[in-house]
Design a protein with these regions (language model features):
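Alpha-helical transmembrane segments and their helix-entry boundary regions
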Residues: 57, 67-72, 128-129, 165-166, ...
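C-terminal ends of transmembrane helices
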Residues: 49-63, 113-132, 185-188
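Small-residue-rich segments of transmembrane alpha-helices in multi-pass membrane proteins
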Residues: 1-13, 67-83, 133-146, 206-213, ...
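Juxtamembrane/interfacial segments at transmembrane-helix boundaries in multi-pass membrane proteins
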Residues: 4-55, 60, 82-103, 146-164, ...
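Residue-level recognition of transmembrane alpha-helices
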Residues: 1, 75, 105, 129-133, ...
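Predominantly late transmembrane helices and immediately cytosolic-facing juxtamembrane segments
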Residues: 52, 177-183, 247-279
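Hydrophobic alpha-helical transmembrane segments of multi-pass membrane proteins
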Residues: 39-46, 73, 103-113, 167-172, ...
Length: 320
């Protein structure tokens, strides 16, 4: 709520100074508005993404929400914050973004590493995936910081790569994270539990469930031939051109992500079968129908990324 209030106040004062809500006119006049307006809009988006340290609402909200709501929050709502950076901050406040790009990248890096650290400590699968989401979406904001540095026109390739990477990462993570939360919801519905250490050997009991869970997790890990790989490769290519040190540091987040996600797979699906869950039902036909489009899109965007990059390039050209 506070983030929405800050953003609303920022928009109201932006109108007061410019006399318009038209994006084209704002792109011309936004360079000269009060820094407080930029800070208000930035604060609202900071909460919505979210970025550390304004992320404290996310884990309790995601953990307490019903599965469909959590899927909506991670698949759509968090991406609206990133969309706000691309659609509002980048075109309307380019000078302010350029001035504060380093700070934005620093907080994005902090969120990447802090999100991974928090995920490593979780045993509740829903909270673990929440902090994984915090970690992954921060890569998008890292790319936004790169756009600010590249906005002087000297890094045109970096600007295009980072923008396309951000768009593809929103798409890829939205699919994988929503699918994983759906599967954890099914697990909780079948067993009444969602602890990482409550299970074991489920791959032998529910092979279809395990196969889909592995695919979605590997997409989150950024394995080749999946959408997550193409997205992260583009973001890192764009950020490395303007901030190589920060980019190298951000790869530590990838290593930590591999640790907590692979540990999750090992604890839940491998080892001896828990006798309590030997009769646990596998995915039903309807559940497979829900998950199949997600899997198809993940591999499509990973194997044929040009299909999506041609589309996102048109969007990229609309952003100054």
């Amino acid at each position: 709520v506070l983030g929405s209030v800050a953003m609303l106040l920022g928009f109201l004062f932006l109108y007061r100074e410019t006399g318009t809500f038209d994006f084209i006119e704002l792109a011309e006049k936004g360079r000269d508005v009060s820094p407080l307006i930029f800070c208000a809009v930035l604060a609202g988006l900071w909460v919505k993404v979210p970025l550390a340290p304004l992320h404290i609402w996310q884990a309790p909200a995601y953990a307490a929400a019903p599965t469909p709501v959590t899927m909506l929050l991670t698949g759509v709502m968090s991406k609206m914050g990133v969309y706000g950076f691309l659609r509002i901050i980048v075109p309307i406040f380019p000078e302010q973004l350029k001035q504060h790009a380093g700070t934005l990248m620093a907080f994005a890096l902090l969120t990447i590493l802090w999100g991974a650290f928090l995920a490593l400590r979780q045993t509740d699968l829903k909270r673990l995936l929440t902090f994984s989401s915090l970690n992954h979406v921060a890569y998008c904001v890292l790319g936004v910081g790169a756009l600010g540095i590249a906005a002087d026109g000297l890094k045109v390739d970096a600007h295009a790569l980072a923008t396309q990477g951000i768009i593809l990462q929103m798409f890829a993570h939205g699919l994988a994270a929503a699918g994983l939360f759906y599967l954890v919801g099914l697990l909780e519905e079948r067993t009444g539990l969602r602890g990482r250490n409550d299970f074991g050997g489920l791959s032998a009991v529910t092979p279809r469930f395990a196969a889909v869970f592995f695919i979605l997790t590997f997409c989150s890990l950024g394995l080749p031939f999946m959408a997550g790989f193409a997205a992260e490769f583009l973001i890192f290519s764009g950020t490395f051109a303007v901030a190589p040190g920060v980019t190298v540091a951000a790869t530590l987040g990838l290593l930590a992500t591999a640790v907590f996600l692979l540990t999750m797979l090992q604890r839940v699906f491998t080892g001896p079968v828990n006798e309590q869950y030997k009769s646990m039902p596998d995915l039903t036909r309807n559940e497979i129908l829900i998950l199949t489009p997600i899997i198809i899109l993940i591999f499509w965007a990973g194997i044929y990324p040009t299909t999506w990059l041609e589309f996102s390039q048109k969007l990229t050209q609309m952003i100054p």
